[in-house]
């Protein structure tokens, strides 16, 4: 459950280490984002020679949340932290590698590239 001002880890190799959610996309009154939702983020901490710089604004897709996601069989998949993958204007991942597991819920949407790059799909 991500809202404005939420800090997230970055699960790709773009050079960003942490980002802050500045907007949840998908309606003017939308308050929360879950796994698979697109948000606008500002880079808060970046590696010195990374592809992105501190202060830049990007779209991102949420790939892990501490709140978790409920499956139709009743199981709940939770993670230790919130994480996102940075996207370009065409909603394709900017990085070429994904770190850590992602959930199967990303497969049904338009993020097959992220699922194929991920080392583990839960």
UniProtKB/Swiss-Prot annotation:
<comment type="function">
    <text>Binds to 23S rRNA. Forms part of two intersubunit bridges in the 70S ribosome.</text>
</comment>
<dbReference type="InterPro" id="IPR019972">
    <property type="entry name" value="Ribosomal_uL14_CS"/>
</dbReference>
<dbReference type="Pfam" id="PF00238">
    <property type="entry name" value="Ribosomal_L14"/>
</dbReference>
<keyword id="KW-0699">rRNA-binding</keyword>
<dbReference type="InterPro" id="IPR000218">
    <property type="entry name" value="Ribosomal_uL14"/>
</dbReference>
<dbReference type="GO" id="GO:0022625">
    <property type="term" value="C:cytosolic large ribosomal subunit"/>
</dbReference>
<dbReference type="InterPro" id="IPR005745">
    <property type="entry name" value="Ribosomal_uL14_bac-type"/>
</dbReference>
<keyword id="KW-0687">Ribonucleoprotein</keyword>
<dbReference type="GO" id="GO:0006412">
    <property type="term" value="P:translation"/>
</dbReference>
<comment type="similarity">
    <text>Belongs to the universal ribosomal protein uL14 family.</text>
</comment>
<dbReference type="GO" id="GO:0003735">
    <property type="term" value="F:structural constituent of ribosome"/>
</dbReference>
<comment type="subunit">
    <text>Part of the 50S ribosomal subunit. Forms a cluster with proteins L3 and L19. In the 70S ribosome, L14 and L19 interact and together make contacts with the 16S rRNA in bridges B5 and B8.</text>
</comment>
<keyword id="KW-0689">Ribosomal protein</keyword>
<dbReference type="InterPro" id="IPR036853">
    <property type="entry name" value="Ribosomal_uL14_sf"/>
</dbReference>
<dbReference type="GO" id="GO:0070180">
    <property type="term" value="F:large ribosomal subunit rRNA binding"/>
</dbReference>
<keyword id="KW-0694">RNA-binding</keyword>
<protein>
    <recommendedName>
        <fullName>Large ribosomal subunit protein uL14</fullName>
    </recommendedName>
</protein>
């Amino acid at each position: 459950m991500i809202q404005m001002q939420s800090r997230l880890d970055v699960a790709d190799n773009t050079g960003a280490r942490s980002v802050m959610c500045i907007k949840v996309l998908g309606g003017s009154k939308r308050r929360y984002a879950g796994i698979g939702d697109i948000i606008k983020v500002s880079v808060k901490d970046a590696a010195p020679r990374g592809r992105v710089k501190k202060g830049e604004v990007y779209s991102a897709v949420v790939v892990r949340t501490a709140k978790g996601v409920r499956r139709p069989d009743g199981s709940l998949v939770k993670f230790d932290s919130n994480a996102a993958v940075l996207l370009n204007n065409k909603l394709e991942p900017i990085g070429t590698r994904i770190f850590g597991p992602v959930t199967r819920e990303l497969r049904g949407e338009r993020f097959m590239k992220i699922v194929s790059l991920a080392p583990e799909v839960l």
